[in-house]
């Protein structure tokens, strides 16, 4: 409907296409994904059901340069441990980074916050202590706990060792079940779904999300050179904390004003 087209374009900057679900439509969808993600997610769909009525697509792309990039000359090889198994990989290393840090023995975690560029965004890396299962840590994470972590982190000098990594993730059934667990059920029920504000007789048949992330010395999916500021010290030996991410960790890209 014209009102829906106007709303999603004006309020969300979204694009709406009316297509026959054939090979040309599939190519158009994947071309959209390629363009919107700078080639990082070249294909969001590998097929379209001939019975499909609608498809909602969301491809995430983030490009950020560290405020203080890791120096490549300090990158080294080492072992990453996961459930007793080791993988030989590259670790970015930087001594005495002045970054926000939080640790809690009671919660069994430590975390760092690595700012990008002008600090509007940052990457938060959460490292469960040895012996703490990462899945337990993630499942126990609430909005309140996250806000407490962010509010309790303080600026420290930290020796950081973080593996370079690249990840590609696809969410389809898990995304649908997650929405249903939050109470969004009628959307997938032909007898109850009411999307008449979009079009008549419409039902959501699939929701799929593809994401891509690459973390290296320069930043997250970035290729740039950034200056580094040096400051003087009082001459006293500073207290330096070690953050060695050589075991499973989880991360999030955070927007500063909203946490």
Enumerate the language-model features and the residues they cover.
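Residue-level signal for well-ordered, solvent-exposed loop/turn and beta-edge residues enriched
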Residues: 85, 258-259
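Feature captures eukaryotic membrane-trafficking machinery centered on endolysosomal pathways
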Residues: 113-115, 237-258
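Non-catalytic, conformational "gating/processing" segments within enzyme and secreted inhibitor domains
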Residues: 1-131, 147, 151-236, 240
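Catalytic and substrate-binding regions of extracellular carbohydrate-active enzymes
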Residues: 142
């Amino acid at each position: 409907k014209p009102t829906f087209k106007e709303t999603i374009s004006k309020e969300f900057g979204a694009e709406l296409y009316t297509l026959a679900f054939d090979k040309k439509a599939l190519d158009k969808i994947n071309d959209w994904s390629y363009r919107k993600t700078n080639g990082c997610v070249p294909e969001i769909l590998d097929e379209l059901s001939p019975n499909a009525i609608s498809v909602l697509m969301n491809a995430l792309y983030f490009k950020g340069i560290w405020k203080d990039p890791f120096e490549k000359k300090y990158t080294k090889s080492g072992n990453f441990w996961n459930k007793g198994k080791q993988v030989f990989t590259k670790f970015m290393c930087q001594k005495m980074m002045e970054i926000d840090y939080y640790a809690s023995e009671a919660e069994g975690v430590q975390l760092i916050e690595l700012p990008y560029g002008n600090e509007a965004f940052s990457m938060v890396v959460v490292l469960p202590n040895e012996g703490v299962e990462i899945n337990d840590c993630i499942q126990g994470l609430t909005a309140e706990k996250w806000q407490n972590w962010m509010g309790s982190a303080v600026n420290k000098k930290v020796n950081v060792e973080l593996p370079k990594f690249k990840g590609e993730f696809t969410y389809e059934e898990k995304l649908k079940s997650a929405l249903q667990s939050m109470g969004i059920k009628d959307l997938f029920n032909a007898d109850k779904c009411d999307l008449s504000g979009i079009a008549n007789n419409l039902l959501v048949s699939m929701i799929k999300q593809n994401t891509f992330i690459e973390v290296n010395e320069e930043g997250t999916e970035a290729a740039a050179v950034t200056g580094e500021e040096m400051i003087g010290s009082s001459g006293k030996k500073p207290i330096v904390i070690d953050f060695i991410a050589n075991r499973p960790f989880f991360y999030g890209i955070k927007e500063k004003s909203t946490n």
